[in-house]
Amino acid sequence: MPAIIAHPGMPLWIDLATTDITAARNFYGQLLDWEFEELDGENSGYVVARREGMPVAGLAQVPEGSLSMWGLCLYTPDVVSSHDAAVSAGATSALEPRSLGERGAMAMLLDPAGAAIGLKCPADEHALLAAGEPSTPVWYELLVGDKWEETLEFYHELAGWDIRQASNDPEFRYAVGELEGGGLAGMWDTSAMEQSTSLWTTYMGVADIDKAVSQIPALGGVVVRPPYEAEFGRVATIQDSTGAILNLCEVAEYDPAQDDVHEPDLFAPEG
């Protein structure tokens, strides 16, 4: 599995806040073939999920009665300055910048629409991520329940994204955040829906979506929406065994013999 070099503003890391970390490990270990590493010291209780040795996601326990959910962090080389700039651009600080020891530094914000978004700077010299392959994130989508224009402008200011309006139909407004012409995330105006909400969602790659979805009930999860054809492939929506919502997207296995470039790879250095 190739490592991708992240550039400022790119999605860098996903975390699962879960009410049952043991159940979550069993669910994703079987579904995505993840291995798990338990950290100690100041990060005791935090679990890193890996695929073929590459870090893919983090898992953290939250109290019973909390909502299990996936969260997204964007890469920044300076968490403090990015946090302060985000607040000036209309965000609300949910977690002040702090050191995570060997995990680097991070902060959490609520964007103008109310969706949680993290900022992260790894402790390593280079920001590397696993993405675009089975068992790794392949796409991110923001549901915007309020303040559509303000939210688009916010991510342009915070992450440096060029915002491309893919559809400006009043009944379906959709935009894509891009860097150097490569799409990083979608943004969907959900304000007209009866139960509109604002949150970031993740699409996880799987090699065979029908096989993956068929496993969900036996693993204690729920198939929220069975596989269907979308613009970028076959996708499905599931709920894991602790209640967290996740999208699945069918993608090809990495083949180094092929000249296959996934969207995040567009920012890797040439040579």
Which residue stretches match the model-derived regions?
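N-terminal beta-strand motif that seeds the catalytic metal site of vicinal oxygen chelate
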Residues: M1-T22, W70-L72, K120-L152, L158, ...
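Core segments of cupin and vicinal oxygen chelate
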Residues: A3-M54, S88, E96-G104, L142-G183, ...
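A short, local hydrophobic-aromatic micro-motif
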Residues: L12, A57, W70, L95, ...
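Vicinal oxygen chelate
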Residues: D20-T22, R50-P55, L72-A113, E180, ...
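Conserved short beta-strand elements that form part of the metal-binding/catalytic scaffold
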Residues: D33-S68, D111-A123, D162-T197, S241, ...
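Short, well-ordered, mixed-charge alpha-helical segments that flank or form enzyme active sites
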Residues: E102-G104, A116, H126-L128
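Intrinsically disordered, low-complexity, positively biased terminal segments
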Residues: W148, D162, A166-Q195, Y203-M204, ...
